[in-house]
């Protein structure tokens, strides 16, 4: 009798387990489908302790692949895989918490999981922790702990190539080099900076190549050598490398094999021509905190160096800093003066900024008509921000007659260049059926998803964007989601080919 009861319990548990497996999958696929059978087989392997099965199953619950997204089940299986040594399992948990992808958005929980991956030796999460301590993002700012994690990530054992999220050990080597250059947590040491930059530069990390080129130009940590400066600056200029690319110094040596008298003069002049763009790049990095710790004073210093050589982008950047009072006291007249210098050279960004100044009457008489004139000049150059501003103008009827079709046209042009505010605007239009278009949750989800990938909004705004994206996802069937992802990929390919997307890619590098 007792044996019979135990047997019944065992049979009942097996039945409940099978029903649970089916229920999990039936929300997406028929119970007798290959997909559901695959999920059941994988879960059985995972229950038996198979690390690979635990990782795959956890990833599917995190992503909503084959099964309904369930972050609690994702944690269950990925943590089991992590305990068996799968650092990537912990990385995935950190990633989903960090970006709110089917998980509650939580920087603190993301860092907890990233730390587990880092302690297992994952270089990308070691660098993420270094950044968190360096910038005080999720942890109290602590340069000593930042150094500790950067050193682990920069270890030669991590030099094999590209790793998750950050690039390679080269990125951490670069950050360590900058800390030595500025004496952050360590005594200032330009020679150590040069050593670290060379390691990263030789691994094709372009920020380090540029930094090393500047070091050779000024003789900081290395002997002054214009030939080496030209070589590394040329290697590091984003987009300069093409198949069959030959450095400028090699071209000079080939053309003048015996001429060494004038070589340093030639290299110096060549380096000077390149230097303005490099100085501007450093300004951008300091301004935004890309590759370097955010510092508006240092950003302004580098921008001024480049602007003194007539670089329009640097002139516009200084205008932005005066406009917003970053690193300097807010001064609309100074902003206008710098914008006009850049706009005279035809820079679309400066033309757009002059349009915004006119629209809001900052430093000049308010004029919607003048604003539209500046926006049109910049939009003719395919400048996404100007296209977006024209979309806003046609949407609200400021400076032009209100026109829903034109508003949608300009928003779409900007969005397809990767401009986040335009993508967000399209998401809202399709989600609520505005601007004369019918409500379309698939299109709304696509554009909100795009916007959430590279948003520069505040954390609160970003959370709202992600929440709306996830809400829309929940309204779509599996077939609709498949169609939506296919459409997303087509649009993304367009964006990836645009100039704006290249800027985003360099920013994220």
Where on the chain are the PLM-derived regions?
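Bacterial N-terminal signal peptides
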Residues: 8-18
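Canonical positions in the second alpha-helix
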Residues: 43-45, 80-81, 116-117, 152-153, ...
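Terminal, low-structured helical/coil segments at or just beyond the last alpha-helical repeat
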Residues: 460-509
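N-terminal leader/linker segments that initiate helical-solenoid repeat arrays
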Residues: 16, 20-59
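Short helix-capping/linker turns of helical repeat alpha-solenoids
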Residues: 47-50, 63-65, 70, 83-86, ...
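Structural signature of tandem alpha-helical TPR/SEL1-like repeats
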Residues: 32-39, 68-77, 104-113, 140-149, ...
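Hydrophobic face of amphipathic alpha-helices that form TPR/SEL1-like repeat modules
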Residues: 24-25, 56-63, 67, 92-99, ...
